[in-house]
Amino acid sequence: MSAALGAVIGVLATLIVFTFVNRQKTFDGDYNRWRKLNLILQQIQENYVDTVDVKALTDAAVTAALGKLDPHSVYLPPVELEASETELSGNFEGIGIQFNVPNDTAIVLSVIPGGPSEKAGLQQGDRIIRVDSRDIAGQKTPQDSMVRLMKGPAGTKVTVTVDRAGEKIPFDITRDKIPVHCVDAAFMLDSTTGYIRLTKFTRTTYSEFISAAIKLKAQGMTHLIFDLRENTGGYLDQAYLLCNEFLEKGDKVVYMEGLHRSRSDLDADGRGSLKDIQLSVLIDEVSASSSEIFAGAMQDNDRGVIVGRRSFGKGLVQEPINFTDGSGVRLTVARFYTPSGRCIQKPYSDHYAYDIYERYTRGELTSADSIKVNTDEVYYTKSGRRVYGGGGIVPDVFVPMDTTRASNFYIQCNKKAVAMRFASAVFDRYRSELSQIEDFASLQSWMDSHKMDQQFLKYAAKQGLKPEPGEWEETSSYMMPQVNALVGRYSKLGEEAFYRLWIVVDKTVEEARKPHELF
């Protein structure tokens, strides 16, 4: 990219400084500055000594120009734009499975009900060995490459060959539109506390969320723990709709303003169905954009307790500009502001992309005292609590990243993905039993009766890994929930089982369940 741009600059200098016999060109100095780039590219195309890939050069120039604006104004080539839009659309076109690659073979974790793969006969636990004529098992094929092989336009066909209990079975599958769910998990933690995990703000976020919340409310939920950790955002309108469910009429949600965009305010209409629900919002250093709009609105209105670590700090609004060749630009046109008036966009810097790593090195992820706030940007919530702008949402209740749970045995097992491989082996051995488990209590009972901890230690030993004397007693307290969660994912309960078993050692959830009188 920089080399291509350097070539452009070099050609410009040559045109200006040197005089070529019979080839000298001059341009009226009164032309619009924005035409300069077009003129340069035109001269390169018409006069450069060698053949030039004009598209690549144009892409590089546009990318470099946008890079001078802000970190979130970007140019997206056709493939990247399609992937970005698919991620947020709430559906994609493919065969309708979720799979994992614990060794070098893709194993089907779940088959989407009613989807093409279920109709064709694929089952949970099938090992995918070939897609059309391409072998993918044992080939060290990257997981994203496997995804691309199986995705494709609705109506097109693909042959997926699987290994099922030693038998190789080909399935002819007609691709179709597949829904992508953004609510990963929704369940009751106890008789009054519900938990919802949202991974993205897509086109279907509001409908998925409100459906889950209503079901939990019917089960007795009076306190919701809403998990926005690792949620990088998405559509702003979906964040507004979620905020509206919790706020009173006239409460401020967010406003946007830019040099060429007049101020636009979004307020709650008071028609929300969750205004009586106690709320805890979980955030971390990856929570960004729409996640921060929601967390900021709840914090500034003193509507919910924000628990976790300082959020990412993206306070910019992008507008899509798409081109006929399938590429597009996401151009920052405004900043968004929380109800108290703060913009939570963190400063642009040369180290912007490494900000989270820098937070870790200076101790912010492990100590509340190390949180970096801009004391020049002080704002106040409805009840008069002090909050800060200019660098993400600072939680009301800080929960440090847990770095103490890292025994040598645990680290070595993670390096070799032993837990993931063990879960796959357990599924192979107990497939019929796991397929008959209908509820979470039965799953827990099944795991206890099958002594998962002892089986895991034996499996790890076969991989050449054994805990030191006395090491397992402490390590098991945080390692076995991870192992059990991976095994539970192979049951009918899927992602719900995974999160319910993992949450046992989740200190942020534990903190959110405690009473916090802040306002």
Task: List where the protein language model places each region.
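Extended, small/polar residue-biased N-terminal targeting/export presequences
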Residues: Y31, E46-L109, G155-A185, L501-R513, ...
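Polar, glycine-rich mid-to-C-terminal structural blocks
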Residues: S290, D302, R309, G313-V373, ...
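Cleft-lining beta-strand/loop regions that shape enzyme active-site pockets
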Residues: V21-R33, L41, Q45-V49, D53-V54, ...
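Hydrophobic membrane-insertion alpha-helices, especially the h-region
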Residues: S2-T19
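A sequence-level detector of short linear motifs
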Residues: A137, P170-D172, R330, Q345, ...
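Generic structural signal for buried aliphatic residues
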Residues: I128-I129, V158, I344, V387
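Conserved functional hotspot residues or short segments at active or partner-binding sites
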Residues: C343-I344, Y348-F519
